[in-house]
Curated annotation (Swiss-Prot):
Changing C330L: Greatly enhances DNA binding activity. SMART domains: BRLZ. Belongs to the bZIP family. Residues 152-178, 216-228 have a biased composition (Polar residues). This is bZIP transcription factor 16. GO terms for biological process: positive regulation of DNA-templated transcription. InterPro entries: bZIP, bZIP_plant_GBF1, bZIP_sf, GBF-like, MFMR. Residues 333-368 are annotated as: Leucine-zipper. Residues 1-16, 133-145, 314-327, 398-409 have a biased composition (Basic and acidic residues). Keywords: Activator, Disulfide bond, DNA-binding, Nucleus, Repressor, Transcription, Transcription regulation. Changing C358L: Slightly enhances DNA binding activity. It comes from Arabidopsis thaliana (Mouse-ear cress).
Length: 409
């Protein structure tokens, strides 16, 4: 949809731009077509993050006001439910779209872009014309954005995930969200940039070399890009877009090294181990503030050692209390056994005493019975009836008989 709208708007705006001079070579006509395709977005002046800087920039003193690193309508955090802005729009737009024209009285090296009075964004190279010298100067200015696009094509493709194939639409940004602006920007102008880079033999850089140069920092293509490679770094470092992470887990600011920064952040080292689990460090990544990345393990080991010592101490205390309780019970049982033994001894002594008394009575009874057996049986006394009392008359007669018997003898 975005590419169709860009083509329609480019067809409508092609008559407004003046035609190139007849003395220009055929190679200069291709940049103009690419520039007109880049001018398709009418509100591109509102999305610019940097102003154009011509090649003879040299060492320009910094202005009192800083560069507008962000758009006027961009938020630090995107609203809820909307994908975050990609990194493509944060880079200088000279590689993908043309810069708006500046008024005649404005400062040529001004860091702020100024729209034209008629409200239409036009290429600064097309505003000059009339003489051969002006035509040559316009050709140089028209070639400038295209060279910048060839130089920064590798870095933009690396950011947007494109592999120099115009058929693929991989609008995934660095933080994993789907970006529509990156898709429209890369698909709308990558075809013209790829064609110009292949047809132009003076550049000497293809897509792979541009990617290698952009990965190395983009310093090799600094003069061809028309701007120093330093402004790219503050964009990704000064204006971080925080991704929506899980609750309770602090996420690092997203940049080109999002994977290394996220997995290398010491989030697990700062959280104490709840169940004694040691966080596994990522090999090859050293956490900030430590040389070997293992300073958290001794702390966890000390914590586990303290818990182990506390458990041992509590076990010792419980064992000592149980031993004391058992010893007290044993002492009580021993005292009770001694008391019972004493009572048993006393009872046994009393039983023995009663037995001896019983034996004495038994012997006395037997002696008395023996004495009675010596006497003859009496007539009036029956020995069998012990309980029967003898008659007094009979006893008196028996006594008289005994006395008479003794006298006779």
């Amino acid at each position: 949809m975005a590419s169709n709208e860009m083509e329609k708007s480019s067809k409508e705006k092609e008559p407004k731009t003046p035609p190139p001079s007849s003395t220009a070579p055929p190679s200069s006509q291709e940049p103009s077509s690419a520039v007109s395709a880049g001018m398709a977005t009418p509100d591109w002046s509102g999305f610019q993050a940097y102003s154009p800087m011509p090649p003879p920039h040299g060492y320009v003193a910094s202005s009192p006001q800083p560069h507008p690193y962000m758009w006027g309508v961009q938020h630090m955090m995107p609203p809820y439910g909307t994908p975050p802005h990609p990194y493509v729009a944060m880079y200088p737009p000279g590689g993908m779209y043309a810069h708006p024209s500046m008024p005649p009285g404005s400062y040529p090296y001004s860091p702020y872009a100024m729209p034209s009075p008629n409200g239409m964004t036009e290429v600064s190279g097309n505003t000059t014309g009339g003489t051969d010298g002006d035509a040559k100067q316009s050709e140089v200015k028209e070639k400038l954005p295209i060279k910048r696009s060839r130089g920064s094509l590798g870095s933009l493709n690396m950011i947007t995930g494109k592999n120099n194939e115009p058929g693929k639409n991989s609008g995934a940004s660095a933080n994993g969200a789907y970006s529509k602006s990156g898709e429209s920007a890369s698909d709308g102008s990558s075809e013209g940039s790829d064609g110009n880079s292949q047809n132009d033999s003076g550049s000497g850089l293809d897509g792979k070399d541009a990617e290698a140069a952009s990965e190395n920092g983009g310093s090799a293509n600094g003069p061809q890009n028309g701007s120093a490679g330093t402004p790219i770094l503050p964009v990704s470092q000064t204006v971080p877009i925080m991704p929506m992470t899980a609750a309770g887990v602090p996420g690092p600011p997203t940049n080109l090294n999002i994977g290394m920064d996220y997995w290398g952040a010491p989030t697990s080292a700062g959280i104490p181990g709840m169940h004694g689990k040691v966080s596994t460090p990522v090999p090859g990544v050293v956490a900030p503030g430590s040389r070997d990345g293992g300073h958290s393990q001794p702390w966890l080991q000390d914590d586990r050692e303290l818990k182990r010592q506390r458990r041992k101490q509590s076990n010792r205390e419980s064992a000592r209390r149980s031993r004391l309780r058992k010893q007290a019970e044993c002492d009580e049982l021993a005292q009770r056994a001694e008391v019972l033994n004493e009572e048993n001894t006393n009872l046994r002594a009393e039983i023995n005493k009663l037995k001896s008394q019983c034996e004495e009575l038994t012997t006395e009874n037997t002696s008395l019975k023996d004495q009675l057996s010596l006497f003859p049986p009496l007539e009036g006394i029956s020995m069998d009836n012990d309980h029967q009392e003898p008659d007094t008359n009979q006893t008196g007669a028996a006594e008289r008989k005994v006395d008479s018997y003794k006298d006779s003898t």
